[in-house]
Amino acid sequence: MKNLKENLLPTFNQYILPNGMRIIHEPSASKVAYCGFAVDAGTRDELENEQGMAHFVEHLIFKGTAKRKAWHILNRMENVGGDLNAYTNKEETVIYSAFLTEHFGRAFELLVDIVFHSTFPQREIEKETEVIIDEIQSYEDNPSELIFDDFEDLIFRGHPL
């Protein structure tokens, strides 16, 4: 059984930097790599008057940094066949990239720039507000999403999740 476990389960290495940031690494022979930042902040952390902010910020971080406009952010990984994306859930906000291993430096530098140097341009805030409103309306028109939300409310009553 031990041999089976060793062969099937991935081996993760974990490092904790002096600033508390945790790095998790899984060695792989694949030519495709994934890199990202998971921020321990999601919708559960929002106060009632802040609902939707985590998701809003997730959208806005792609809209500009101190050295890049939105177009440059979106095309930086696409130009080399990579992908750049993000998502927000109740527990976390994640921004990540998938790319050929030879482009690790490019992906990591871009992610660091986005996570630590986003500028949140006013004109983009106004545009993205409309996008988020459309997403909310689409979500509210989806019965399965509404049922799932009601189910979670019953299970986690009185809990941030």
PLM regions with names:
Residues 66, 73-161:
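Acidic/histidine-enriched segments that form metal/cofactor-coordinating
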